[in-house]
Amino acid sequence: MVQSELQLQPRAGGRAEAASWGDRGNDKGGLGNPDMPSVSPGPQRPPKLSSLAYDSPPDYLQTVSHPEVYRVLFDYQPEAPDELALRRGDVVKVLSKTTEDKGWWEGECQGRRGVFPDNFVLPPPPIKKLVPRKVVSRESAPIKEPKKLMPKTSLPTVKKLATATTGPSKAKTSRTPSRDSQKLTSRDSGPNGGFQSGGSYHPGRKRSKTQTPQQRSVSSQEEEHSSPVKAPSVKRTPMPDKTATPERPPAPENAPSSKKIPAPDKVPSPEKTLTLGDKASIPGNSTSGKIPAPDKVPTPEKMVTPEDKASIPENSIIPEETLTVDKPSTPERVFSVEESPALEAPPMDKVPNPKMAPLGDEAPTLEKVLTPELSEEEVSTRDDIQFHHFSSEEALQKVKYFVAKEDPSSQEEAHTPEAPPPQPPSSERCLGEMKCTLVRGDSSPRQAELKSGPASRPALEKPHPHEEATTLPEEAPSNDERTPEEEAPPNEQRPLREEVLPKEGVASKEEVTLKEELPPKEEVAPKEEVPPIERAFAQKTRPIKPPPDSQETLALPSLVPQNYTENKNEGVDVTSLRGEVESLRRALELMEVQLERKLTDIWEELKSEKEQRRRLEVQVMQGTQKSQTPRVIHTQTQTY
């Protein structure tokens, strides 16, 4: 009340005038009253009315050519009849700043006119017009960096924002001075009235904010659409490296990475594997006509189909992450297709070779990779051979083959744990899981084949080496991949490698014994149950060296079993060999159980992370929608 009295005194001209005019309005009844014959109010009324009705329009017309819109910062309760009630967030149209009282403006808010204190509203800074656009460009810029899908969408939206924000400003400046025309324009503008009735800048800001979340929501929806294709890796890979994420959003466009790693890649790789497998099978057929070509061809086909299945999820797992990798890995033609997702360093390519093309590819591709290493490794392998000493020269040769080929693989596998840590683990997890399923699916029929043909064992030894080589390279790489999957440092990964290596080392001894056992399958039937890994180590070795002189190397193993049958008949202790094989089998089963546990744990972690990310995305989407809806409702209430 004190404020109102203080304000009334300086505003005696305005407020007292209004009050006296109201009093005179009360006197209207007194005009017809015979007790009050005073005529003085009559002649005085026109000037008052004229001062109110005719004096203010000129001011209004003077200022309305550039109408200003202010936003109310604080609530204001009117204390006089001519004051305007303000609510926080309302938009006030300033009709005149030249009132009789300093610090008071005349304006219109929600269809009511009146005066209000100027410090209750926020003046529109002219510079702020550009801020929303800059904010939009800044918000879209970081989106462009991590996501290359955004440049197409963000640029047009920025242009739309520019046009949208400039549109209202043009409409604002082109308004006619008359009040009715303003009302008409505001009504005609409909939902766009928010621009004309309430700050052209703030709606622009709202649009910018609403459009950028929409962009994000579109991209997130696309990512969710692609997430079933990408499998869990989508959830994990954004965190490890953001160089990968920029290339991910194209994945929805590429779908199962059809553009980046074209479908021909998936097709030619089988073709290459088949052709190379045929090459490998040709020497096999030349050395021994026992091996029918169909035996080898189906195995490549078998390998092709599961690996294609594996390759499709792999390629879709990290389609764009491998773009950088594909270029270095393409030299290794075959496995760059199916293994490229798991590769982020060329050393990793050396491991996938057995995985990818264990049949015939393993021979040429591995040799390309390993030939520089074979000389050193053969030196070390010969040391190992001397360490393992076997009486017969054939045994030594065979051990050389085994060790020379186990050690390259083992050393490569030992190298690989160092290379993969930069690789996002999720891709390798998926690879490991895919290959585990393949190993389980492939090894059982192959063991059945092994058990089914004991009599024709010498003849089948060569196809089965390749078949088992497929199972082993798949299983061995799965070990390699699981170690990086757990994101263990190389020190932790190497112990696993060392667990495999001792078993490989034992396999070198016992694979020789196996070779002794395998030829006379009639005598030693239980040996056919030897786990695929052991044989695969033995047979992984064959495809590696054959290319230089494939006929000789393949012929040697075929001759060695016959000599071994003679040696065995001369007195090899079969029971000790069985015991060793059993111990090896148990160790391998333990490893398999452990790896399965780890895989299940990793799979559960990935599932939980996937769910968490989906929840977060849903929350973000809901939050953006909630934040958008009140603004939209608010602008609509202001326009009407």
From Swiss-Prot:
The gene name on file is: SH3D21
GO process annotations (BP): actin filament organization; cell migration
Which segments of the protein form a coiled coil according to its record? 572-626
**UniProt entry tagged with the keyword Coiled coil:** yes
State the species of origin.
Homo sapiens
Q: List the disulfide bonds.
A: none
Cite the residue spans of the region called Disordered. 1-60, 133-361, 401-551, 618-640
Keyword entries, A-Z: Coiled coil, SH3 domain
> What is the taxonomic lineage of the source species?
Eukaryota, Metazoa, Chordata, Craniata, Vertebrata
**Protein's name according to its UniProt entry:** SH3 domain-containing protein 21
Q: Where are the transmembrane segments?
A: none
**Compositionally biased region (Basic and acidic residues):** 177-186, 401-416, 459-469, 494-532
Domain SH3 per the UniProt entry, residue ranges = 65-126
